[in-house]
UniProtKB/Swiss-Prot annotation:
Gene Ontology CC terms, in alphabetical order: cytoplasm
Name of the gene this protein is made from: NBPF26
Species lineage: Eukaryota, Metazoa, Chordata, Craniata, Vertebrata
CDD domains assigned to the protein according to its UniProt record, in alphabetical order: EGF_CA
Organism: Homo sapiens (Human)
Olduvai domain residues: 427-521, 698-790, 791-879, 882-937, 938-1029, 1032-1104, 1107-1162, 1163-1255, 1256-1348, 1351-1423, 1426-1481, 1482-1574, 1575-1673
GO molecular function (one): calcium ion binding
Acidic residues composition-biased segments: 427-443, 792-801, 812-824
Keyword Cytoplasm assigned: yes
Disulfide bonds listed in the record: 28-41, 35-51, 53-62, 68-79, 73-90, 92-101, 109-121, 115-131, 133-142, 148-159, 153-168, 170-179, 186-198, 192-207, 209-218, 225-236, 230-246
Entry's family note: Belongs to the NBPF family.
Misc remark: Encoded by one of the numerous copies of NBPF genes clustered in the p36, p12 and q21 region of the chromosome 1.
Stored Pfam families: EGF (PF00008), EGF_CA (PF07645), hEGF (PF12661), Olduvai (PF06758)
This protein's name: NBPF family member NBPF26
Amino acid sequence: MPALRPALLWALLALWLCWAAPAHALQCRDGYEPCVNKGMCVTYHSGTGYCKCPEGFLGEYCQHRDPCEKNRCQNGGTCVAQAMLGKATCRCASGFTGEDCQYSTPHPCFVSRPCLNGGTCHMLSRDTYECTCQVGFTGKECQWTDACLSHLCANGSTCTTVANQFSCKCLTGFTGQKCETDVNECDIPGHCQHGGTCLNLPGSYQCQCLQGFTGQYCDRLYVPCAHSPCVNGGTCRQTGDFTFECNCLPVPDSTSSATNVSMVVSAGHWSSEKAEMNILEINETLRPQLPENKQQLRNLKEKCFLTQLAGFLANRQKKYKYEECKDLIKFMLRNERQFKEEKLAEQLKQAEELRQYKVLVHSQERELTQLKEKLREGRDASRSLNEHLQALLTPDEPDKSQGQDLQEQLAEGCRLAQHLVQKLSPENDEDEDEDVQVEEDEKVLESSAPREVQKTEESKVPEDSLEECAITCSNSHGPCDSNQPHKNIKITFEEDEVNSTLVVDRESSHDECQDALNILPVPGPTSSATNVSMVVSAGPLSGEKAAINILEINEKLRPQLAEKKQQFRNLKEKCFLTQLAGFLANQQNKYKYEECKDLIKSMLRNERQFKEEKLAEQLKQAEELRQYKVLVHAQERELTQLREKLREGRDASRSLNEHLQALLTPDEPDKSQGQDLQEQLAEGCRLAQHLVQKLSPENDNDDDEDVQVEVAEKVQKSSAPREMQKAEEKEVPEDSLEECAITCSNSHGPYDCNQPHRKTKITFEEDKVDSTLIGSSSHVEWEDAVHIIPENESDDEEEEEKGPVSPRNLQESEEEEVPQESWDEGYSTLSIPPEMLASYKSYSSTFHSLEEQQVCMAVDIGRHRWDQVKKEDHEATGPRLSRELLDEKGPEVLQDSLDRCYSTPSGCLELTDSCQPYRSAFYVLEQQRVGLAVDMDEIEKYQEVEEDQDPSCPRLSGELLDEKEPEVLQESLDRCYSTPSGCLELTDSCQPYRSAFYILEQQRVGLAVDMDEIEKYQEVEEDQDPSCPRLSGELLDEKEPEVLQESLDRCYSTPSGCLELTDSCQPYRSAFYILEQQRVGLAVDMDEIEKYQEVEEDQDPSCPRLSRELLDEKEPEVLQDSLGRCYSTPSGYLELPDLGQPYSSAVYSLEEQYLGLALDVDRIKKDQEEEEDQGPPCPRLSRELLEVVEPEVLQDSLDRCYSTPSSCLEQPDSCQPYGSSFYALEEKHVGFSLDVGEIEKKGKGKKRRGRRSKKERRRGRKEGEEDQNPPCPRLSRELLDEKGPEVLQDSLDRCYSTPSGCLELTDSCQPYRSAFYILEQQRVGLAVDMDEIEKYQEVEEDQDPSCPRLSRELLEVVEPEVLQDSLDRCYSTPSSCLEQPDSCQPYGSSFYALEEKHVGFSLDVGEIEKYQEVEEDQDPSCPRLSRELLDEKEPEVLQDSLGRCYSTPSGYLELPDLGQPYSSAVYSLEEQYLGLALDVDRIKKDQEEEEDQGPPCPRLSRELLEVVEPEVLQDSLDRCYSTPSSCLEQPDSCQPYGSSFYALEEKHVGFSLDVGEIEKKGKGKKRRGRRSKKERRRGRKEGEEDQNPPCPRLNSMLMEVEEPEVLQDSLDICYSTPSMYFELPDSFQHYRSVFYSFEEEHISFALYVDNRFFTLTVTSLHLVFQMGVIFPQ
């Protein structure tokens, strides 16, 4: 052991150093300053250090700004800062809650403020409190002056104040008003026995005993060895009557010869007394400490042993260096600290959930109590009313009766009263109610007999026949029919007491819903009841018992917290020592592990036990949460049932009230019984009205008072004629007997049949619909309820005179006949197996089916407004739905004409047509099911429809597995929409819609469509109903389908990979996902399109004809006719027909040999004036996929032509902007996708309607209409040989060009959006995204720019032939391996390059409205770009002036200047690349431009690796925008923008920004029209000169972090954001960002600016730090 002492000391020293040093040790090296925000790095002796932060900053690196510098906590809350996270939380004072303590709780401490005179109120419980008074005041509420301050009580007594008077509570032995007098106990004889002497002491006395006695009263004999006076193991031996001897143990290592030491003690009466008392006190003091000291000794031994073992191992291993295990120790400490923080956060989260459930349970409990009390009062009132009417049936003077008719009316009134009693009674007394009913019928028949005869027969009737009854509340019971199912409630009534029980048991099911509560009936009593009360209990966990259980659990768990923490600390220390010992033993090869095997196993068992205890604790807390959730669910269900019963009772009481009011106004008043009968009937009406008040909510008291006043007036005027009474009679409720039954919401007011309602449906796994929650309750997540489906929600008001729609049941397997009547605003939603209702109101639903054998659909429709001006014969019939889920039979579909019909099929069932846009979300997550979800909202449609424009809805016939030829539409549709799924034929729909579909298994293909926010204002002339296409297709055989042969107006067609696609007549949006090898699909997405068109007669273009065989790749039969606004998009393996409107889609092909295409276009507004004979001919397409033959391309001229090729086939030209997303995930395929949305273009033409003569047309051509139809480009391309394509030679108007990585790109004539993904080494792609652009331009003559010419070879990277001509609003975007032209308008794209040698970029610009007035001769010339990718030469950059120029480079090409905000997202996933992503949307800019104000764009010169000083801006720009990545310089930007950037490898840094919804409206002098030169000169003199602020200049080198050259000029709202390695200028608008870094050695940051405060958050080595700057206004 002595040899181990030095090693032990070294080991203890190493442990101390490890524990003393920070978990994340800093190193203050030369040239490396880890501390930020002017923090000082202080070095320890061990070489590590820490950051000493200045005031206002905190964190390990001083990276966080002190969040508590400005206390945001309200109402006395305390701000608590978390140094490591840089966040702050508010510790609220009692009575307040919320994130900032902004909400107060309804507690007396904050409502009434009971503590007076500055006292502090403390909450003890929910309703109790305690006041802490200030000095000088006392009392329960600090209402009394503290008299104890001036009157001190002596001798340790307690002073209390009562009513401003003091009182001293004296200790034992003192007396007096202030306890100043000592009581002499020795004056009372008998205290000391056996001759003992009493001595008086202050507050007590003492007995001096004679020799031989001891004790407090000298009442015991003295025995020397009785109390073991010998210590340290000595043995006591009595030597005399009053003496004893101690034999002590031998002393270790003693040199003396004495082996036994004895000590004789002689104890007198003083010494024995004192020794005895000392021994007892020491024994009592030390006895509780013995177990604790033993446990401490065991722990110390264990730690000492582990330390010795570590020291021994370290001593034996001489060559081992402790620096090698430093990283391991740090890693272990980080894991332990992280584990501790996660556990603490989890405990806090669970505690917060428990608190929320407690509050919810208490609130529901209060509401239950109120409802029970209201039911009890209503029960008493109905019983009193029943007794009163029974008295009327047995009058004392039968000769004064009104006759048989009055008796029958009174019997009817009694029957209604009895029905009311049944509504509020249990269900198992129905037999007695039937006996009572028969008995009362007999009374009615025998009412004319003498009273004695009736009394003799009444004796046979049970006494409780009218007071005790039970019914079952069903859907169709009572005067108000209800279509909502609800549970039966059994209530028992006993005499003069409240004793009603609700028995709850738990169903046992095969799924996880074992705690679903079912309410079972309880047999009611049979004894008579004269007083009825009702109290409903919510189950074994509800009520005060649940609150008590919560408090008990809280009190039990609280003391265990400190003990668990201490155990955790001890275990952590042991675990660290064990890991260190194991590591040292592992490094020593010569050490035999068998010697410490038992110790290591023991430590591992302890660690596992700790984890098991933690898991058990978590399971316990989870069980508590689950119980609370079950309790909340049960209370919600019970509340729903009580509200339903209240509603039914209220309806019945209203019916009874109306009946009795009719008795008060008889047709023959002369036959009345007189004033006494009228008074009795008035009393009955008063009781009925009182019943209505008892069963109605508080907010209906005013209505009830009106009815009561009306009854009183009727009693006073009962003798008047009926006509006079009718003249003054008030209007009674019209919905007495015809009131529709709807679902009650939180407010319990009366409802009429036209009010919207909400219904929530819950379905459980592997079961059908088990239960239904009626009413809008609190949205609490319940783990046992898997699916919650809100079925109907609407805020609109229904028009009058609309009958209810009959419900539809879809659970039957056979076909059903559906309604044929006409609906004006009909909605149909299919849900299998639940029921489907067709209602007149919009509603919302969400359905989730998570098992194999369930297929459902949910539809969500809300908040639509439809204003229509209808002509004659515009009634449309609703759709009929016929569907067999498993048998896949052909359904019976629509045969009638619908106005604006909507249809969406799912994968395994046919979809009915609905007459309004709607929204839904559907999820199918198992193998063999396919579903569909549709989402659409906020559509406003204002249309004026002429006569005879009722389009017929399509007919659908499809068998899912057999794929037979369906019977499709043969009639004409107006604005028809069609979308097929992968496995069945798609019906046509007549309005745009939106949906999202997910199919996640091998053998299914589906489709989802999404579209919302479409406003369409159209005026359609007569005879413009286009015929919808006919579809014939077999999925597997790929036969030649029968396509359209007729003319369509605005036809749309989109094929999928495995079936033929029908044509649709309106833009739409969808998203499709196919995740297996042998499937190809298509998804389309389009929303927010506003189109203002006026179409002349006879302009219906013919739709294209399609001929296609999927596998054989034969030559298809393509279009031969002329189309107006034609759109064409091919997929990877089939030819694409032409489309007549922009659309959007997204397709995913995840295997080697498949390609697809997806387009996305939304929010386009186009106002065009078309002349006659301007229908451009559509392109002809000839293509063979595998052989890559030269296709026959366009030879004709097109107006507004758009062309986009895919990587493996030629693309025809399209005439409208569109967008797509393409994904090719294997080595040898390249694709791209485009997306264009929200473009509003309003052109102005010469004349909008009518035909013009030839002379007028010739004159119009002379004025500027000639040569405006630009020819579309010709495309020639071979994929593998990489030949030079034949590109454009002609001039185009509004031309747009986008190349892909492996082929040449044709020019297009409109902005667009795309997203491209290429995931292999040798491919490069491009993605562009643009939406929501509104452009209002006035273009003068001779402004048709010519489109650029493009020549490119991908692999050789030859210098391309770039633009030589001037373009007006030109758009061009290259990929990373080809040259980038300049663009003159904002656009957006998303690009992904995932391999080593490629770099891409992406842009996104949305919702930009630009109002410009362009003068003559303002056509800017587009820049010329010359670039070689690998050689990194100096490119030839812009030399000309551009108006609104936009350009964004990737990591390997030069960045032109930008003139407008844009957004993009870029992903670079390898080691040596950096990227940039920006996002800007919803910017409105109103500008007025003078002549010759086109700002020149900046010139940029950049070499990526060498980081050369670029040539930055020297000119003045008007609202210029530029954003560099981390490896290039950043120009200045003048508008807010947003982006998202992801860098996923070791040595890269990125950032992301997001700014949205900024509206900027400039003010100018004049918006439209020309001004003379004199006026323009005068305007410049008045202050219009020099208003274009120059953008800032930025100069920075990435690695060296030098001081950049910042702004020198004045800016007007300029925005600039650099990455982490260069300086940040000031910004004047708030923005936000999120950054993700996924490796250990990365540094990332996120920015957040709000209210002149800028926060920079940086994450490095699993740490997060922030810094902030406050900007001046």
